[in-house]
Amino acid sequence: MAAAVQVRLHQASFSERALDAYRTHCAMCRLKHRELLDAAHIIPDSDPDGHPEVSNGLSLCKIHHAAFDRAIIGIRPDYVIEVREDVLREEDGPMLKYGLQALHNSELFLPSRTADRPSKDALERRYQSFLR
């Protein structure tokens, strides 16, 4: 119970700092509507290594946050976005084509401050789970 309370207490601060670091843009599609953005953890906060630090976070719009959490989209440690192979082969409407498939091999939008950029170690760990 104490861990759950601690997680909730840091969420607002983590979210604010992450969104500010990315200048209120989605790191994948550059959407700038704050009300449609989330602070996503690279290493989940339920993991002992999932610290509430900006370097363990990304500012993502709601669709890209969901796609990242469900391993539809992965991010390599060199900040390149990959879309899962089966999703790349799908045919559907414009949201799939332009909202997901078009991101494949594009570069992540990064914070200006080097210290706020995603941890390459955290990205590597998360990317390995994306590949499975």
Show the residue positions of the predicted features:
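Short amphipathic alpha-helical segments, especially helix-boundary/capping motifs
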Residues: 1-2, 34-37
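The −1 position to Zn-ligating cysteines in a subset of zinc-ribbon hairpins
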Residues: 25, 38, 60
